[in-house]
Amino acid sequence: IPDAQLERLYNTNLFFCLFYSAGITLDTEELVLVTSRSPRYYVSAAYWDRDSLLWSFPTVVDADPALARRMLDYVFGRQRRNLGVHSRYIDGTVLEPGFELDELMAPVLALERYVGATGDRDCLEDNAIRSGLTDILRTLRTNRHRSIALYETFLQPTDDVRSYPYLTYDNVLVWKALR
């Protein structure tokens, strides 16, 4: 990066993404993703697809593709049964209910980014990933408008209940994931 200030900012973000967005559990030594490992964050050690996959994952893919692959295994494994639910514990159970379209699309967008960055198309044959994508498409169909290609959400990306069911930001994520 030619700009020293920008490089410093990138490296700070990289450090956070590598060391604060994931950890190893003490009991099972399993990789888990979290909103943040920092005790200063108001929801530390919970799991949100958006935070892990739309915010941290792009940097992790650039810096450590092997870790990025393990992150996808966790998402499409441990977290798969509640994809699209607002927030979850690290074992995949629901912490705070409520459907969020951006949370549902985050695994698809992360997978697309991973394959594009690494060229690893073998991951697309993984049974857990294939099942997860099938689950996501099924959930997406149940939230589609009956006559136009818009998809409904219950919670906004701000985690507040939405005033209108069809949000532009969320539907752009659907468009990007399905193109």
Predicted stretch roles:
Residues 1-45:
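Acidic/polar, glycine-enriched structural segments that form the non-catalytic walls/loops
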Residues 17, 111, 137, 178-179:
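A structural signal for well-ordered alpha-helices, especially hydrophobic packing surfaces
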Residues 20-27, 142-154:
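C-terminal ends of transmembrane alpha-helices
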Residues 32-41, 83-99, 150-166:
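Acidic/His metal-coordination segments adjacent to aromatic residues that form catalytic metal sites
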Residues 42-146, 171:
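Aromatic-rich carbohydrate-recognition surfaces in CAZymes
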Residues 171-179:
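Active-site neighborhood of glycoside hydrolase catalytic domains
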